């Protein structure tokens, strides 16, 4: 019998990644605007309360996040030490906690970091609205990845996605209107999928 590992509630208790052990000059994310700029990932949050049947849910259902100070200090370190031009703010759903994402965007803007880097994230269409998207854009977000998974509502319901095709259409239009690029994830071969 293997018990699940205990959740780390205060993510700030975790040390910074040992990036000094890596060849940081070789890290270029494929989603960057030029594919040549130094681009790095910061893990900012863990956990997702949704029950999509295909998900691995490594970090459990409880959403926890680093403090905004920890995140903005790590962004500054990546800019100053490694020449970061782009950052991926890694979280299952960055926009899940409205207060957290508002505080984070405001902290990024207050430190002027949006003038030095641009960033990407992953989100769900049922956790954003026009005002939030505008704030994300103003804080330097240039691309949001949404997990669409399928263009079939029947298949979305089958995998318990909890979102409607109409929501994707609406939020994609809003995202595009505020000037944020969209990246969509799809799965092929969901059980019972025939076309």
Predicted regions and their residues:
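Glycine-rich beta-alpha loop elements in corrinoid/cobalamin-binding modules
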Residues: 1-11, 15
């Amino acid at each position: 019998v293997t018990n699940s590992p205990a959740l780390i509630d205060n993510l700030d208790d975790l040390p910074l990644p040992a990036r000094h052990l890596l060849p940081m000059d070789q890290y270029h994310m494929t989603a960057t605007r030029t594919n040549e700029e130094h681009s790095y990932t910061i893990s900012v949050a863990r956990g997702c309360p949704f029950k999509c049947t295909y998900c691995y849910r490594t970090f459990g259902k409880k959403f926890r996040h680093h403090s905004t100070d920890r995140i903005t200090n790590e962004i500054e370190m990546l800019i100053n030490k490694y020449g970061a031009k782009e950052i991926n703010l890694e979280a299952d759903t960055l926009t899940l906690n409205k207060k957290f994402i508002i505080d984070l965007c405001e902290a990024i803007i207050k430190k002027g970091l949006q003038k030095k880097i641009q960033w990407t994230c992953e989100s769900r269409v049922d956790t954003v609205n026009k005002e939030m998207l505008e704030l994300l854009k103003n804080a330097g977000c240039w691309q949001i990845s949404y997990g669409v998974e399928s263009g079939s509502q029947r298949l979305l319901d089958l995998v318990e996605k909890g979102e409607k095709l109409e929501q994707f259409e609406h939020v994609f239009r809003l995202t595009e209107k505020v000037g944020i690029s969209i990246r969509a994830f799809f799965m092929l071969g969901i059980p019972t999928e025939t076309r």
